[in-house]
A protein has these predicted regions:
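N-terminal secretory signal peptides that target proteins for export/translocation
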Residues: 1-5
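Bacterial N-terminal signal peptides
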Residues: 8-20
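Lipid interaction determinants
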Residues: 25-72, 76-412
Length: 412
């Protein structure tokens, strides 16, 4: 049986956006070929999947608390837009829940202003989604809205917020394939260069319900042409391929501009961040970044990186047990590495019983190479390469976010 959707809700979803005025002026963001505002009382877009972003509702009184505006994949337009929408209807559904969502309103071609578009509605009985595909400049774009939909009241609230926010938002979208200018202009030479690194202390709440302090690390790479990358650049310290970063929908890079005694970072998605000069370094977001030296190409490593963690539940929480884990990677000067990781969960040892589940993953290891400021891992058995930044900071050697226990030597 198809999930039920109120008739008024479906009628509203059939693109009232085509004639609805957009929201008031808001901060603009960019993701791939789409330029869009952040609606009032919605959070800035976030996402761990490189192909999508979500803007969570932040409406007063927890109204539609779990509602999200969704920005998904895009592709070259080919064939029927409604068929493309149907083929991608599970893009915003967790992999282990994809069989649970049933279509309540099949993909239907409906124009959105002068653009071809299609709409589909689906639900798993507790959550509902309305998906929209829009063709612009020869490309298909997938957008969506989801929220609670377990009963008539939840459906009504979700539908009302959709009508008030998502539908007007659709009318404000701009598309780079139609000639809309990027929010990130061409860079201007900025005079910065090299790798900068810093750390800060964060307070977090552990599974044992106790507050803990842990260090967070940050790296930012600058190039003289005015480009920066926040994190691990795909090409390391080699000159960045801005076109490839843009095409890959990467949002961790952008332009920097020196202004007076400070600096402004403008990310590819439109976010901005200010940095202030502090001695020889820069302070931003709680981090003080100082310039560090990348390891030279061909550096040989003799040592290891390791970690171990444990968390348990505090007395009085009604729970016992916890989780632990650890890992170690050993590097040899001849270019080999080997590693292992282990993890386990356990319960109620305090009462003398307990159980242990989980196990180890003894990695076969492989070869490593230092190039362009990166430590590149080439695993055995044809697995994909991965890389972390490798550099000297003060008297330590950092491999990604780990301190090396050992030594490095120059290439032979």
């Amino acid at each position: 049986m198809r999930p039920r959707f109120p008739a008024a809700f479906i009628a509203a979803a059939l693109f009232a956006a085509a004639v609805t005025a957009g929201p008031a002026a808001a901060e603009m963001r960019q993701f791939g070929g789409l330029i869009f505002p952040v609606p009032p009382q919605f959070d800035d877009p976030v996402g761990t999947d490189p192909s999508q972003r979500a803007m969570w509702s932040n409406l007063p009184d927890d109204r539609c608390e779990y509602c999200r505006i969704l920005i998904g994949p895009e592709a070259k337009a080919s064939g029927s837009i409604s068929r493309w929408l149907d083929q991608n209807r599970e893009a915003f559904v967790d992999e282990d829940e994809r069989g649970d969502f049933k279509v309540g309103k099949p993909a239907t071609n409906t124009p959105l202003g002068k653009r071809d578009a299609a709409m589909l509605a689906q639900s798993d009985g507790s959550d509902m989604q309305v998906l929209v595909a829009i063709e612009a400049g020869g490309r298909f774009h997938l957008l969506g809205f989801d929220g609670d939909g377990g009963d008539e009241d939840e459906l009504a609230e979700t539908g009302a917020v959709l009508t008030e926010t998502f539908l007007p938002w659709l009318a404000t979208l701009r598309f780079r394939a139609e000639g809309a200018p990027s929010l990130l202009p061409e860079p201007v030479a900025g005079g910065m260069e090299g790798l900068w690194w810093g750390w800060r202390s964060d307070v977090t709440l552990g599974t044992d319900m106790m507050m803990k302090t842990q260090n967070s690390y940050r790296t930012v790479t600058f190039w003289p042409d005015g480009t920066f990358y926040d994190g691990t650049p795909p090409l390391g310290l080699a000159p960045p391929d801005r076109a490839a970063l843009d095409a890959g929908r990467d949002t961790d890079w952008g332009n920097y501009v020196r202004q007076g005694g400070g600096m402004v970072l403008t990310y590819a998605d439109g976010r901005t961040e200010k940095a202030a000069r502090e001695g020889d370094g820069w302070t931003t977001g709680g981090f003080t970044l100082n310039r560090v030296e990348p390891l030279p190409d061909g550096t040989r490593i003799d040592g290891r990186i390791s970690w171990i963690s444990f968390s348990g539940f505090a007395p009085g929480t009604g729970m016992t047990g916890g989780a632990g884990g650890g890992g170690e990677t050993v590097f040899h000067p001849d270019g080999r590495y080997e590693g292992s990781s282990f993890g386990t969960a356990f319960g109620s040892f305090a009462e003398g019983g307990g159980f242990s589940v989980g196990g180890g993953d003894d990695a076969a290891g492989g070869r490593y190479e230092v190039r362009d400021g990166l430590l590149v891992f080439a695993p055995q058995k044809g697995k994909a390469e991965r890389a972390v930044l490798a550099f000297s900071a003060d008297d330590s050697v950092m491999l990604g976010t780990d301190f090396l226990e050992g030594s490095v030597s120059p290439p032979r």
